[in-house]
Amino acid sequence: TGVLTHSLLFWRSFAHLIGGMGVLVFALAIMNNSKNGHHEVMRAEVPGPVFGKVVAKLKNTAQILYIIYLTMFVIFAVILWLCGMPIFDSIITAMGGAGTGGFAVYNDSIAHYHSDLITYVVTVGTLLFGVNFNLYFYILLRKIKFFFQDEELRTYFAIVAISTGLIFLNIFGIYHSLADSFKYSFFEVSTIITTTGFGLTDITKWPLFSQYILLLLMFIGGSAGSTAGGFKVIRAMIIAKIARNQTLASLYPNRILSLHINGSVLDKETQHSVLKYLAVYVLIILSLVTILSLDNQNFLIVTSAAASTFNNIGPLLGTTDSFAIFSPLSKLIMGFAMIAGRLEIYPLLLLFLPKTWSKT
C-alpha cells in the first residue's frame, strides 16, 4: 500500500468508480427535471460514435445504466471476496475493474495475491466492463439473441481471443508451464484492451512482438458505451469498413456500396464524424509522441507513453522504469493528455457551449 491510508485508497478508487460511467451521466441520473442540453451531455459522456437510449427518457436511461453498472460492481466485489481476497481489497479491486481505472491496494497489483482463481476472476470481470452497457439491458429484457448478435461485441471478443492466442504462442517458452503462459497472456490482453492497467507480470520482458500487440490494443480500447477508454472497437470497425468500401469503389466504380452495422445502414453523418474523430485522435497521438521524443527515449517507450496516458491505461512498454524517466514538461503534457483522453476530447469542448447550460 506504500504510504497511503485505507481512507485515501478508498477515495482514490471511489473516484474512478463514479468516473467510470461518467460523472456527467451520474449527475444526469440524479437530476429531477429534464433540461435542454441533457441529450448533448449524455451523448458526449457515453463513449463512441453511436449514442442510443435504452428507454424514452434520458434520465431513466442514465439511471438504468448506473443500476446495471453498480450491480455488476457489487457482484464483482463479492466474487473476489469469496475467492479469498480480503473484503477491503475486494472492494478496491472491484472499483478498479469496474471503472477500468486499475488502482489496486498493493504496489504489485493483482500479482500480490498469488492466486490463479483471483487472476481469472479479475480478467473476466474487466472484460465484461469493456462491453457496451446498453447490451446488458437486452439481457434484463431477456433478449439474449440481441446481445450475442451485436457486431461490436463479437469483434471485441474476437480481438481478445486472437491477441491472447498470438501472445501465448510468442511467450510460452518464458514461463514454466503452458497454463502460466495462457494466464499471463489472457490477463494482460484483458487489462490492456479495457484500459484498466492492472499488473500481474513484467511485460517489458516479453518479446517485442507481444509488446507491440499490447501497444495496438492500447489504441483500440474497449466497446462504445463501456467504461473502457481508447479509440473504441466500433470506431475501428467503421474505419475498416470505410476503407473496404473505398477500395471496392475504385475497383467497381458503378457499384452502389453502403456501410452496415448490426444489419442497419450507417448514415454518412456518423461515418464523417468517425473520420473526423480519427483525424483529431491521430493528430493528438503524433503530437504527444513528438513532444515526448524530446526526452531521448526509444520509439516503443514514447509511443506507449502517449497511448497509455491519452487512453488512460497506465503501463509503460519498452522499459522497466516508470514514467519518472520523463521530464517535468513531458509529465505536465501527459497530465493534460489523460484529461482530454478520458473525456474523449469533445465533452471538454461541450463545457464551453452555451446550449449545454441553457435553461430554456
Residue ranges of each PLM-predicted region?
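Membrane-proximal intracellular helices of multi-pass ion channels
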Residues: 1-360
